[in-house]
Amino acid sequence: MARNELGEFLKARRAAVAPDPRLLGDLRPRRVPGLRREEVAQLAGLSADYYTRLEQGRHRSPSEAVLNGLAEALELDTSARQHLFALARAA
């Protein structure tokens, strides 16, 4: 089975982003650090189901608009944004 590099990258970046209470409201204690899938989806303007499919490798061809939304939601710098786009093209 091929590795899901795009999904692995998304999951790692999601874990690295601190939730912002001004944007997300409900910040109950978390079992794991970072954003929840639903929160990334909300911030990126995607459905939670679609984001989950991307992260799990069940959808591998996101549009440029989706990638830009994810880059903003995950607070990616220029280098990480370029890496995200490269992974999406390779998937």
Tell me what each language-model feature is.
Residues 1-11, 62-91:
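Short amphipathic recognition helices of helix-turn-helix/homeodomain-type DNA-binding modules
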Residues 15-19, 45-49, 60, 76, ...:
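Short helix-loop boundary/capping segments at the starts of domains
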Residues 16-17, 40, 56, 84:
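Sequence-pattern detector for short linear motifs
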Residues 21-25, 55, 66, 85:
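Residue-level detector of alpha-helical recognition elements and their boundaries
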Residues 28-31, 37, 44-61, 71:
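Recognition helix of helix-turn-helix/homeodomain-like DNA-binding domains
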Residues 39, 50, 80-83:
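Residues in the helix-turn-helix
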